[in-house]
Amino acid sequence: MSLPLPEGRKRRVWPWVVGGLTVLLTLGLLTGVSFGHYSVKRSFPQTSGVIELAGLSAPVDVLRDERGVPTLYADTMDDLLFAQGYVHAQDRFYEMDVRRHITAGRLSEMFGKDQVPTDSFLRTMGWRKVAEEELGLLDEKSLRILAAYSQGVNAYLQDRSPADISLEYSVIGLINPDYEIQPWGPADSVSWLKALAWDLRGNMSDEIYRTIMSAAVGVDRTETLYPPYPFDRNRPIVDGGNVVDGEFVQDPPGLQVTAAAYGPAAIPAAAMPALTDVLQASAGINDWLGEPAR
């Protein structure tokens, strides 16, 4: 047999109940926020201190500017490429992993059967197959560069859980618990060049849209949707130079071009300043310049 609590006792009990629930909810919220913060930051790159890595023949310095952009200094090309692979994996391995699945037509392995039609198209393009065939045609120096870079990427992946590599893998684990990260290889690097070539094959539709918009609302407003590259913020490391006899030269000798040879190019050259106002300037760098004799 239970008896009702006196009215005064009820008033004393409710504040304790409400206070207890408030404390529990607050603790739960703080725990959730702390766990979320930890889950996000656990895969962030280490940007200070010293990292001991097997595979380097000498120390490599990695300096980051105020925007986090790294600049690497090494004594040998092998060490430089090794460190570049490591730093790339630190900063963006998930993106790299998605891209190699794109070029191989294996997106469904990451994201499920909905990606099968996309994989079918990508395998028809054959980017991965072409990349693997090209590896057999590369010289020893190129293969060594690709191998050193791959070793650096894999040095970062070694002994790290998917969640330590990138937050996105925790999400993939919920929809595809069987997914496993594979080591990086030279073909993964070369195959993305095929995708870049596809992406840079032409930007006709963008140029049409930009031209129409420029005529309708003006160049300044159009550039809010198609902004030019911010050279004032991200200055090129090398502002000139050329490759001469297989080596980079900062100030190469100029081509001897006669006035007669230049004459036919004068008309389109004069029109270029007007065209650059309406044509997109930041789609990519895929330009070639040949001397008249070629």
For each of these PLM feature ranges, what is it?
Residues 1-11, 271:
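Juxtamembrane low-complexity tails/linkers enriched in Ser/Thr-Pro and polybasic
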Residues 2-4, 20-24, 274, 288:
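Acidic/proline-rich low-complexity IDRs
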Residues 30-294:
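Substrate-recognition/specificity elements adjacent to catalytic centers across diverse enzyme folds
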Residues 7-27:
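N-terminal Sec-pathway targeting helices
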